[in-house]
């Protein structure tokens, strides 16, 4: 009798109830999942900052491809490793070492970063790639290495590259 009554009911109202229940289920489940679970199928490629995700047991080693001090023109092995993992999502957290390595040349930096993005798109064609902005540094670091004053300019160029290559850009400058 209940089923027959519902069959005659407003379909839009029933769909709305289902949608609300699914949303509630999603919210409840999302809070219980660890970062390790949330990053299953994703990989972060980066340098020493990225390596901290495994050092401090935040993410599984299968979600992190990192090397301390790595430069954009030295990523062949990391790209091979990412290809083997074949993730659906790739986060790139690179560039801090390259601000100094390129002597503050943002155009050279973008050229090298673009080559990395292109190679990853070829190596893992179905993956969604997200490029993280270079984190800003404290004024103390700028005084020690004035080239770090160019980070904002590097990030602007990086965003332009992402727009041009249709790659997602994550501006993390407000997080620090």
Specify the residue positions occupied by each region the protein language model found.
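N-terminal secretory targeting modules
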Residues: 1-39, 55
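Alpha/beta-hydrolase-fold catalytic nucleophile elbow
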Residues: 93, 132-133
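A short helix->loop->beta-strand "cap" motif at the edges of active sites that frequently abuts
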Residues: 124-128
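Charged helix-capping and loop-helix junction motifs
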Residues: 106-116, 147-154
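Extracellular glycan-modifying ectodomains
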Residues: 1, 52, 97-98, 123, ...
């Amino acid at each position: 009798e209940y089923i027959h009554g519902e069959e005659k009911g407003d379909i839009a109202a029933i769909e709305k109830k289902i949608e609300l229940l699914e949303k509630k289920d999603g919210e409840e489940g999302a809070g219980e999942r660890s970062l390790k679970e949330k990053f299953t199928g994703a990989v972060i490629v980066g340098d020493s900052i990225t390596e901290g995700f495994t050092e401090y047991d935040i993410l599984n080693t299968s979600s992190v491809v990192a090397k301390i001090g790595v430069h954009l023109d030295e990523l062949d092995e990391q790209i091979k490793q990412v290809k083997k993992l074949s993730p659906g999502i790739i986060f790139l957290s690179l560039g801090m070492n390259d601000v100094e390595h390129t002597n503050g040349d943002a155009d050279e930096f973008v050229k090298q970063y673009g080559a990395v993005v292109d190679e990853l798109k070829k190596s893992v064609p179905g993956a969604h790639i997200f490029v993280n902005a270079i984190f800003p540094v404290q004024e103390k670091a700028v005084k020690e290495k004035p080239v770090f004053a160019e980070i904002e300019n590097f990030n602007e160029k990086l965003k332009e590259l992402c727009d041009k290559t249709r790659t997602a850009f994550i501006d993390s400058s407000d997080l620090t």
